[in-house]
Structure formats: structure tokens, C-alpha cells
């Protein structure tokens, strides 16, 4: 995939870059694998705002993705590589030998006509899915389960890859894209290869309107609000925040404070992410 630039015919176009979509082979999605996607606008089931800066955006349909890959031993042919508006990576449509169709997230190097398979006896080949205990140490992997049978949860965004560092007993040690070193049960499955759409990190949004197309609303600084809206608000003219340290809209320290809950899985983290 390449990044496409434009002639600077307007201030918005001047900085904007988009993906070339060279790898896309089909524009209309598989109808049987579509579901309606209702907009949440950052609200919970009570209608209360729980996530700020969300709302609007282009209408989307959800593509049902197979994250579990439990059709063991049945080969599937890659029929197409498609765009998915709900994620940064591309998706691949698989036609299984028994006639079933499923989507998977597309790793780098997976092309139309390739054959993929899942199961403990699968080859170490891009797109194949197998338990961590059957994958050689040093292999790049993605779409990793955290619990056996739950489906891939880790390393699913464009260009991401984890590395299998060691296998010891019932656990495998992974190095995640964040730099975190973590143990995962060796029975958990992962897919071989690095995530596709590598150039995604080089895309420049270019203008505010494009953020709105994505369903992202403006992020307003607290210092320009009124005191009723934010602890940083108020004052005459351009005033400082009036506190020793910046805080969130709810008064908690914004910089340096730990936000991660204590979990039973903390003991599986060998080294925290690099900041």
C-alpha cells in the first residue's frame, strides 16, 4: 500500500494524505456477513455520556469477523481483500472448502488465491492460526487470544505484530507492540504474520471535517471553558490553570497518576510497556 498526496488546491487538501487502496480487490462487502451498526455517540444504556469526543460520522455496516478461527483442518481460499470502515486493518474474505464464507483481518503479504488453514497441525505460514505452543520461538504473530477459545483480542491494528519470545510450562511469553512483555496461556491461539496496511501510520488527516467523517468530535481545552465546565476554566483573558498540576474534568490528577486497576492478571505482566 502506498500513501497518496494531492495538489494543494485548498488548505485542507494541502496536508491531507490518503491510502492508495491498491490492495483492495472488491468494493462491495459480502452481504451475508453484514450486520447493522447502531451509533452510540459515547452514551451508555442510560443515555449518559461515558466517552467524550464521539458522535456523528458516516453511516457504517458491521462486518462480522471470525476472531476464533475454530474451523480446524478445513482449508480456505482468499477470495478478496476488502476495506473495513470499523478498523484500521484490511479484511480478507475466505471461501472454505465446505462452502462457508468468513472474514478474517488481513495480515501483511496475504493475497487473493492464497490458502490458509487453522488448527494445531497447520503450517507456520502467514494467515494460518494455531496454538502458541505449536509456534516456533521468534515468530511474528497477531490476533492473539488472552483466554483459550475466546477469540483474538491482542495485536489487531494496522501494521502491528507481537513476537513469541519464550515457551515455559503452560505459558508463552510475548513481546507486544507497546514493548510490554507478557505471559499468555500456551493453549491460546494466534495467527502467523504481521498485520497488513503498514502505511496507516503515515496517513495525515489534514482537516477537521475528515475527523467528523470518522465520528470524532472536537477536543476542547479545559482552560478555555467556564469554571462550571472544567477545573481549569475561568479567569480574565488568557489565564493559567490556577493549580499545581493539570487535572481531568472531574478533578483527578491528569499527568503521572496511575489509572490501571489492580487485576489478577497483573502477575502475568513481566515488564510494563515502554513510555
Swiss-Prot record:
The protein, known as: Large ribosomal subunit protein uL2
Functional summary from the UniProt entry: One of the primary rRNA binding proteins. Required for association of the 30S and 50S subunits to form the 70S ribosome, for tRNA binding and peptide bond formation. It has been suggested to have peptidyltransferase activity; this is somewhat controversial. Makes several contacts with the 16S rRNA in the 70S ribosome.
Quaternary structure and partners: Part of the 50S ribosomal subunit. Forms a bridge to the 30S subunit in the 70S ribosome.
UniProt-recorded Gene Ontology molecular function terms: rRNA binding; structural constituent of ribosome; transferase activity
Similarity field: Belongs to the universal ribosomal protein uL2 family.
Gene that specifies this protein: rplB
UniProt feature coiled coil, ranges: none
Classification via NCBIfam families: rplB_bact
HAMAP family: Ribosomal_uL2_B
SMART domains: Ribosomal_L2, Ribosomal_L2_C
Pfam families cross-referenced by the UniProt entry: Ribosomal_L2 (PF00181), Ribosomal_L2_C (PF03947)
